[in-house]
């Protein structure tokens, strides 16, 4: 019996062109000079969480700026420059600072070149923020009358309300602050030349005859910095402050009431946890969308 002729149905296959995204390279510039700190841990955790929640191939390297004079090259897409101990004034002229400012000038040069379509995005934290302000002549870096340590309200200016990095924040929002130095007297003409603006200031205290510190600046379209610590992790920092050793240090330096108020603020979901979950993730969002087009 002959086998019947079978005609296979014609199937039209549509092949989807899959766009393979390259890894986003992040450089963390460590300015802690080997001192024990929570900042680096917090930055790593934010990058881990951000990469996982957004299904991104996020790779990073760390550079010991002050001890080893290490700085990244221009193969990185995003730079996060940490806080650190000591005076942002006394390091002037040091070898590590020369290397750091050379890196910063390379970033600015790259971003100013129209041929470079993918720009480099930078976030400066605390000590790095003060160094950038001094180097770029954005404002006056001075020693405070007393140490700022604790959880404080940060007040947005009009420019800050339109800042993509602050999207979703209240006004004021709360941040961890730990510093002996501050940036005051912004040079507005210099900021305008760079395309920058002051975004936030510290709490208004009309009864105190001191200048209010600048708490955040957008330096250029691709560089932003904060005086406070947006990377501060409420849960991790709360546990850290409740260890016997750290509790003793804080109480001896700042008093029991300050320690107790920090624990209370850290456990408030509308304060540090809210800031932690918005500022650096917003910065990474904005940067990676621009990088990947």
Question: Whereabouts are the PLM-identified features?
Answer:
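Short polybasic linear motifs
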Residues: 1-2, 7-9
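Pocket-forming structural segment of enzyme catalytic cores
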Residues: 137-235
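Short hydrophobic segments within beta-strands
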Residues: 27-31, 125, 178
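A short helix-to-beta-strand connector/capping loop
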Residues: 55-58, 118, 171, 194
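Cysteine-nucleophile active-site neighborhood
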Residues: 86-160
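N-terminal beta1-alpha1 cap of cysteine-dependent amidohydrolase-like domains
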Residues: 8-110, 234, 238, 244, ...
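Residues that mark the start of a beta-strand
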Residues: 23-25, 121, 174
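Flexible, charged surface loops at secondary-structure boundaries
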Residues: 21, 71-75, 116-117, 168-170, ...
């Amino acid at each position: 019996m002959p086998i019947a002729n079978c005609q296979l149905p014609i199937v039209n296959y549509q092949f989807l062109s899959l766009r393979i995204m390259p890894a986003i390279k992040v450089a963390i510039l460590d300015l802690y000079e080997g001192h024990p700190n929570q900042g680096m841990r917090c930055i790593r955790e934010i990058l881990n969480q951000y990469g996982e929640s957004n299904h991104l191939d996020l790779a990073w390297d760390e550079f010991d700026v002050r001890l080893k004079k290490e700085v990244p090259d221009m193969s990185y897409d995003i730079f996060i420059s940490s806080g650190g101990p000591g005076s942002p004034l006394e390091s002037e002229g040091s070898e590590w600072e020369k290397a750091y400012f050379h890196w910063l000038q390379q970033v600015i040069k790259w971003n100013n070149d129209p041929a470079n379509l993918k720009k480099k995005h930078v976030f400066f934290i605390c000590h790095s923020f003060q160094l950038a302000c001094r180097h770029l002549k954005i404002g006056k870096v001075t020693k405070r009358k007393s140490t700022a340590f604790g959880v404080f309200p940060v007040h947005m200016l009009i420019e800050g309300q339109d800042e993509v990095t602050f999207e979703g924040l209240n006004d004021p929002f709360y941040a961890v602050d730990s510093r002996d130095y501050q940036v005051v007297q912004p040079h507005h003409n210099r900021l305008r030349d760079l395309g920058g603006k002051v975004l936030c200031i510290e709490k208004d205290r009309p009864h105190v005859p001191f200048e209010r510190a600048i708490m955040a600046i957008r330096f250029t379209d691709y560089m932003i910095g904060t005086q406070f610590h947006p990377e501060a992790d409420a849960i991790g920092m709360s546990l850290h402050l409740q260890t016997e050793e750290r509790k003793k240090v804080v109480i001896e330096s700042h008093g029991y009431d300050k320690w107790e108020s920090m624990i209370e603020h850290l456990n408030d979901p509308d304060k540090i946890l809210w800031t932690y979950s918005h500022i650096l993730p917003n910065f990474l969002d904005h940067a990676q969308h621009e990088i990947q087009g």
